[in-house]
Amino acid sequence: MNNPFTVKRMMTLALTAIMCAGALWAEVNPKPFVVPELKEWKGAEGHTALSGRLIVKSSKLRRVAQTLASDYEQMTGKALSIVSGSPKAGDIVLALKGDKTLGQEGYRINIAANVTLTAPTTQGVMWATRTLLQINEQAEGKGLPKGIITDKPDYRMRGFMIDCGRKYIPISYLRNLAKVMSYYKMNTLQVHLNDCGFRKFFGDEWSKTQSGFRLECDTYPGLTSKDGAYTKKEFIEFQKLAEEYGVDIIPEIDAPAHVLAFTQYKPELASKDYGMDHFDLFNPEVYTFMDNLWKEYLGGKEPVFRGPRVHIGTDEYSNAKKEVVEKFREYTDRYIRYVESFGKQAVLWGSLTHAKGETPVKKENVLMHMWSCDYANPADMKKEGYQLIAIPDGYTYIVPAAGYYYDYLNCQYLYEHWTPAVMGRVTLEENDPCIEGGMFAVWNDVAGNGISTKDIHHRTFPALQTISTKCWTGKKTTLSYAEYDQLRKNLSEAPGVNELGRLGKKSSVVLQKSTVKPGDQLDAEEIGYDYAVTFTIDGKQEAKGTELFRSENAVVYLSDPRQGKLGFERDGYLNTFNYCIPANEKHTLTVEGNNRMTRLLVDGKVREELGPKPLYIIRPQNKANYQVKGADVFVPEVYEPNDYISYQRTLVFPLRKAGQFNSTITDLKVEVK
């Protein structure tokens, strides 16, 4: 007869063994890939499918919830309804919850039966939503991996500076850029509003040299650039959008050097010793001019510059004479205090080692960019009491197609070796309280070199992801660079943003159309690097200016406005192939493009490649003459190649709208190469 106790005990042991075996086979979720890398992850088992409901526990988070819902729908095509009540399975919950260990930007996410995002501040919850969206876009239909995230940044300021003075950057791009920065938890965008090109490329005449001031100005009518500028209204709206996404905008008016836009407007302000790109600091009118200019954007109940900080410039002024150095220091101190009188924190380029002197310069609550140890030694500036922002030129400066600094940042080196504690040849202690954070910069030094906003973004995006990681996660990254670099490419730029023009995977056909009729609207705005666009054309006579395709950013011409050739226009530059569409002939054309060139193939054979083109300066001192002079010697007018612009002829191919052409276009095929 069986013993009931023994049977029960055996059943219990068997059940325990089964449970243990199951536990051995169960997988705890690994840390999700996010940029910047998550600080802490406690994995659990299983996945959570989202319900499509979003519960907000505080009215202060209403705006964050609306942004999350909008972004989620843009990325997935599914609605996220903001509702009240108790959470149900799969709901997303946003809540404010005090926690001193998380600071101002830290947050927690608990992915369990539902998904709860908590932080002490709205900014922290905003960053939590960015993490959630990144994880969700990689979920591949499995749901969100269960686990607990605890995350906060190593450094308070994580940013980027873009030079809009030498090249006009459309406000539409700046708005998208703010969204991209937010998606990667970059919280500071500095907009460099004025600057000038190199005089040597403009006939060595200051009056002809490119300059730009990119903001509407009532105080000085005519100061605003005519080749592209921002109205006050659109600049304010841009800042408001950035605020919604957790990004501070720092407007920069750079002076007392880099001021050619101001001295071309009012020549008497220019230095006679150091060139028109320098103010004459001994001229009282300089201070009246700058006081009034700053007041226009900082004064009033609703100032144009909305954020807590503004940048007063102060880089690269001459230190040739002691009296000039002292005057420069006086200027710097004056405008630190002047912008503070409007309630703003002053930010400036470090120059006080270069301009070492006796005139005191305010240091309390002043942010200084550490861009060059020769101009401002970080160790000395720390002793002085400045708050430091690491933006070392030898690591973090992009100057597109210039031949110096970086065309693309060395992201592998930055990922493996750099943090904001590394300020060039001087390295401070990691997380030193004097270090506010780190940034990188795009300087459009070579005005007129054909670089497009798309080219700038192609350089910016990988750098932004990497600098974001190193400012947030610091030395605590766990992935190799190869792993990180492969995975980061799978992430979107931001919800609803596709400045790179990515349409599909490599070596895939992403769009086909048997016949393209005049005025047709296509499903894609554009295709970015690397691509091939192929079509068959039965040519007809086309008027100059006849378009094939157009987007918001570019136009491809069947017959360009000047010569009637196949060509393209973007960013104010017109480039043409040495090819006219033959009337009454049928050919297959392919346009291939990458970040270095645009190539035309006719019937499968390369016709022409538009790559970087050197455009040389012709100067009398560069004239070549190797002949022995005599009465009957004729000397050719030829010049040694010396300084030149590397002119870029790239194209992100427009696709949105077909033009009004006479030719017949068939068999359109758009490929990712």
Regions found by a protein language model. Give the residues of each.
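Active-site neighborhood of glycoside hydrolase catalytic domains
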Residues: 262, 267-366, 371-380, 384
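Flexible glycan-contacting loops in extracellular carbohydrate-active proteins
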Residues: 609-665
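Short tryptophan-centered beta-strand motifs in secreted/extracellular beta-sheet-rich domains
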Residues: 189-191, 235-242, 533-535, 585-602, ...
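Short, aromatic/His-centered strand-loop micro-motif at the edge of beta-sheets
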Residues: 566-588
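Extracellular glycan-recognition modules
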Residues: 508-569, 659-661, 665, 670-673
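Feature activates predominantly on carbohydrate-active enzymes
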Residues: 101-278, 285-287, 291-309, 338, ...
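Flexible, acidic glycine-rich loops studded with aromatic residues
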Residues: 360-366, 373-513
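Acidic, contiguous N-terminal accessory segments
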Residues: 12, 16, 26-153, 346-355, ...
